From Swiss-Prot:
Source organism per UniProt: Rhodospirillum centenum (strain ATCC 51521 / SW)
Keyword ATP-binding belongs to the record: yes
Database matches in NCBIfam families: hslU, PRK05201.1
PANTHER family xrefs: ATP-DEPENDENT CLP PROTEASE ATP-BINDING SUBUNIT CLPX-LIKE, MITOCHONDRIAL-RELATED, ATP-DEPENDENT PROTEASE ATPASE SUBUNIT HSLU
Gene from which this protein is expressed: hslU
Entry keyword set: ATP-binding, Chaperone, Cytoplasm, Nucleotide-binding, Stress response
InterPro entries hit by this protein: AAA+_ATPase, ATP-dep_Clp_protease_ClpX, ATPase_AAA_core, Clp_ATPase_C, HslU, P-loop_NTPase
Protein name (database record): ATP-dependent protease ATPase subunit HslU
Length: 437
């Protein structure tokens, strides 16, 4: 769990996302409250429930990007999922409880990685012994083993090919099926690979690879042998229950508009009804055991382009008490997006073309013209937010990208005149620009 202060979280998000301070503050406070809750006495800790967030804003203003960056900051089980992927219980498709099952799998992966670090030194010695056995055989003398161990540690044998016995993971890819009549009926998807893996007693197969490649494989195997799998699962479930975060994107797409109800929209409303107990707090059965969702934080977001937030079920609105509106992007925002973030689009294109030996130089008036064009096209055609910059830059640099491999060593300056020359038709003919995306 991250111990960043809200101010630190916002400044971290500022490195990648321009503007939207209200949304950044809301998620920063929510994330910090997770840490604050952990410091409370146990009795009070159970009473403090997370305040779920609803982010509203037009497409392309940074809702999903905030979620992506938050996932890296959270240091907790985090799942980003689209609400449109789910269907009402009883229909063909995935039901919303699958969200928690997926979150548990993510938590198990995170917990295993953390616990592997604790046994890394032991696992490294065991992996080294297995590599030595493959190199010199099981019956080699101690002197020979020591000689090869020294060469191994100095990296002299990294390119040597060896054959090693590793776990056969091919059974893991077998299909899954629902088990009828199990508690909760959705206990779901028992993996045939798990069943066959246990029945076959963990089959092994011989793989041929270089010494350097074998280390990662053997380290993972030996670490897992040293880990208590039950401890991994119980810690992962505890982590989900106390620190889990779910980001529900495109929630506006499952609203039934007030003037159009019936038909397929009933199924959409069904998904909302299924989400109610999940967000409020329920127990979900997974193959690893029951998981309580009382303290899982839900952040929902949607453009609400055709529907309104009030079209959500009133009960669902009540379970998303913190409402944050993200603002549409202006010309000045576009300019900042092109220049300020650590991995801004201009830096990306410069780096890509530098691999061909070309130097790109954007002047200030060239960047201003790009921002103005993007804002104009968004106003006159369809407002798709910052994604419009991808369209404009791809069109602008199309010729340069195509011929870059033949122009190594050249330097190209992109100023306002160059931008107008390349994108003249795009700016003048709005009907034509509809065909770009």
């Amino acid at each position: 769990m991250t111990s960043f202060s809200p101010r630190e979280i916002v400044s971290e998000l500022d490195r990648y996302i321009v503007g939207q301070h209200e949304a950044k503050r809301a998620v920063a406070i929510a994330l910090r409250n997770r840490w604050r809750r952990q410091q409370l006495p146990e009795g009070l800790r159970e009473e403090v429930l997370p305040k779920n967030i609803l982010m509203i804003g037009p497409t392309g203003v940074g809702k999903t990007e905030i979620a992506r960056r938050l996932a890296r900051l959270a240091q907790a089980p985090f799942l980003k999922v689209e609400a449109t992927k789910f269907t009402e219980v009883g229909y063909v498709g995935r039901d919303v409880e699958q969200i928690i099952r997926d979150l548990v799998e993510i938590a198990i992966g995170l917990t295993r990685e953390r616990l592997r670090k604790e046994v890394a030194s032991k696992a490294e010695l065991r992996a080294e012994d297995r590599v030595l056995e493959a190199l010199v055989g099981a019956n080699a003398s101690g002197e020979t083993r020591q000689k090869f161990r020294k060469m191994l540690r100095e990296g002299q044998l990294n390119d040597r090919e060896i054959e090693i016995q590793v776990q056969d993971t091919s059974v893991q890819g077998l299909p899954t099926f629902d088990v009828p009549g199990m508690p909760g009926a959705q206990m779901g998807m028992i993996n045939l690979g798990d069943i066959f893996g246990k029945a076959l007693g963990g089959r092994t197969k011989v793989r041929r690879m270089s010494v350097s490649e074998s280390y990662d494989v053997l380290m993972a195997e030996e670490s897992d042998k040293l880990l208590d799998q039950e401890k991994v699962v119980s810690e992962a479930i505890q982590s989900v229950e106390q620190n889990g975060i779910v980001f529900l994107d495109e929630i506006d797409k499952i609203t039934a508009r007030s003037e159009v109800r019936g038909g397929a929209d009933v199924s959409r409303e069904g998904v909302q009804r299924d989400l109610l107990p999940l967000i409020e707090g329920t127990t979900v059965n997974t193959k690893h055991g029951p998981v309580k969702t009382d303290h899982v934080l839900f952040i929902a977001s949607g453009a609400f382009h055709l529907a309104k937030p009030s079209d959500l079920l009133p009960e669902l609105q009540g379970r998303l008490p913190i409402r944050v509106e993200l603002k549409a992007l202006s010309q000045e925002d576009f300019r900042r997006i092109l220049t300020e973030p650590e991995a801004s689009l201009i830096k990306q294109y410069k780096a890509l073309l530098a691999t061909e030996g070309m130097t790109l130089d954007f002047t200030d008036d060239g960047i201003d013209e790009l921002a103005r064009l993007a804002a104009d096209i968004n106003r006159s055609v369809e407002n798709i937010g910052a994604r419009r910059l991808h369209t404009v830059l791809e069109r602008l640099l199309e010729e340069i990208s195509f011929t870059a491999s033949d122009r190594s060593g050249e330097s190209v300056t992109i100023d306002a005149a160059y931008v107008r020359g390349q994108l003249q038709g795009l700016a003048q003919n709005t009907d034509l620009s509809k065909f770009i995306l």
